[in-house]
């Protein structure tokens, strides 16, 4: 029987291409051709479904829709999702209104001006005869460079009342005025803030006439106080405390926060930023103070109704729970 030949090139030991004849039988070629024709016929039949079959398929798809593949959407891919829903792993945070401060901002840069202002505040403190403690919100600002690190303490801001904030720029000063030091150490003044102890230590390093330890002993860290009163756990920033306690959002613009706080004069954005930090601190203090009074009242009523033993048992249970939370969050 005649044979068909296919020419294929092969390499010899000398890398010379030679032609090798491979015999292919005629009946093998016909079998391959027949198989291809059968596959083509089957595909044609598959594509020629009747209207009834097509309708049945559509009904099946409607009753049992294909499951969507669960995927963790990133911020970039989320916008491209068809349904536009956010990732289920993250809850949408509550939109809080931004803090708006409409009170006075008293800004001083000269040593004698700062001294006179501090003396004025101290006189006001001493007139508060109905209060054993006068809370003053305290905060500081300084320039920061990724090359050289934190600069010298440049701004001290305090809030005595919620309608008035004081901003003292220290850039020109070699020493902090004695009147301001006396105000900070006044027996009735209770300075408060977030991570306030670290601020006092930095102030002492930059201006040795300020002793940090006496201030640390009587100051109040708002985050620690919040955990005690509200039975929360973990560390707090001023921004998170504003969200949790005051239900307000803070505009912590990096451009302002990392700005040149040592340059005189401060611009309007810097002054507002500095004032809001201590203003909201005073708001948070008053809120936690009221919560503490309510808590103490409720505890007293519980003791009267259930006895000291029941109160101590409930208290111990709460402290155990808090300890577990702190282990996780710290």
UniProtKB/Swiss-Prot annotation:
Residues 27-39, 48-66 have a biased composition (Basic and acidic residues). It holds the Pfam family DNA_pol_A_exo1. Residues 1-92 are annotated as: Disordered. One of its GO terms (molecular function) is nucleic acid binding. Mg(2+) 2 binds at residue 139. Mg(2+) 1 binds at residues 139, 141, 277. This is 3'-5' exonuclease. It comes from Drosophila virilis (Fruit fly). The gene is WRNexo.
């Amino acid at each position: 029987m005649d044979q068909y030949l296919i020419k294929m090139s092969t390499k010899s030991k000398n890398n010379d291409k030679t032609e090798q004849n491979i015999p292919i039988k005629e009946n093998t070629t016909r079998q391959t051709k027949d198989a291809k024709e059968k596959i083509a016929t089957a595909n044609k039949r598959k594509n020629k479904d009747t209207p009834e079959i097509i309708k049945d398929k559509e009904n099946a798809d409607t009753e049992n829709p294909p499951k969507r593949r669960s995927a963790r959407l990133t911020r970039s891919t989320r916008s491209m999702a068809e349904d536009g829903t956010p990732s289920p792993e993250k809850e949408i945070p509550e939109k809080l209104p931004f803090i708006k401060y409409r009170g006075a901002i008293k800004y001083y840069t000269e040593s004698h001006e700062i001294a006179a202002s501090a003396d004025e505040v101290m006189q006001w403190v001493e007139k508060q005869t109905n209060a054993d403690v006068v809370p003053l919100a305290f905060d500081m600002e300084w320039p920061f460079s990724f090359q050289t690190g934190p600069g010298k303490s440049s701004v001290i801001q305090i809030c005595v009342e919620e309608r008035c904030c004081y901003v003292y720029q220290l850039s020109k000063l070699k020493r902090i005025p004695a009147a301001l030091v006396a105000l900070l150490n006044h027996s009735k003044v209770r300075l408060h803030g977030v991570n306030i102890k670290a601020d006092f230590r930095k102030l002492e390093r930059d201006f040795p006439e300020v002793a940090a330890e006496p201030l640390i002993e009587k100051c109040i860290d708002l985050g620690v106080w919040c955990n005690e009163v509200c039975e929360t756990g973990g560390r707090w920033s001023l921004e998170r405390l504003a969200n949790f306690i005051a239900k307000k959002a803070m505009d912590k613009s990096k451009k302002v926060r990392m700005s040149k706080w040592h340059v005189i004069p401060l611009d309007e954005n810097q002054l507002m930023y500095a004032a809001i930090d201590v203003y909201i601190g005073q708001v948070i203090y008053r809120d936690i103070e009221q919560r503490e009074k309510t808590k103490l009242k409720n505890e007293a009523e519980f003791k009267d109704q259930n006895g000291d033993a029941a109160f101590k048992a409930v208290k111990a249970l709460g402290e155990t729970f808090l300890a577990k939370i702190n282990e996780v969050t710290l």
